[in-house]
Amino acid sequence: MKCFAQIVVLLLVIAFSHGAVITGVCDRDAQCGSGTCCAASAFSRNIRFCVPLGNNGEECHPASHKVPYNGKRLSSLCPCNTGLTCSKSGEKFQCS
């Protein structure tokens, strides 16, 4: 239980700090490497991670902003990689 509490505190410190990104946690695209964006966690929009851009056939969000985006993304999906577009395929949107 003590270890769990320490992990929770560590995650809160990381989420609310403005320091360097060490674990892939980010605030904005500029903190992520090439080929990635700072996307919201699927579990909490207050936590964001550096996530790879979408490849051919992968799910995407049609309203996702281009990279780099200076604001905070609300989606857990990054835009498609260069040369790909996010288009409807059946019930979902996919990079193609």
UniProtKB/Swiss-Prot annotation:
Primary localisation category: secreted
GO molecular function, one term: toxin activity
Signal peptide: 1-19
Subcellular location: Secreted
Entry keyword set: Disulfide bond, G-protein coupled receptor impairing toxin, Secreted, Signal, Toxin
SUPFAM superfamilies: Colipase-like
S-S pairs: 26-38, 32-50, 37-78, 60-86, 80-95
GO cellular component terms given for this protein: extracellular region
Tissues showing expression: Expressed by the skin glands.
GO biological process, any: endothelial cell proliferation
The family this protein is said to belong to: Belongs to the AVIT (prokineticin) family.
Role, per record: Potent agonist for both PKR1/PROKR1 and PKR2/PROKR2, and inducer of a potent and long-lasting hyperalgesia. Also potentiates capsaicin-induced TRPV1 current, when tested on DRG neurons. At subnanomolar concentrations, this protein both induces potent chemotaxis of macrophages and stimulates LPS-induced production of the pro-inflammatory cytokines IL-1 and IL-12. In vivo, potently stimulates the contraction of the guinea-pig gastrointestinal (GI) smooth muscle (nanomolar concentration).
Protein name: Prokineticin Bm8-a
Source organism: Bombina maxima (Giant fire-bellied toad)
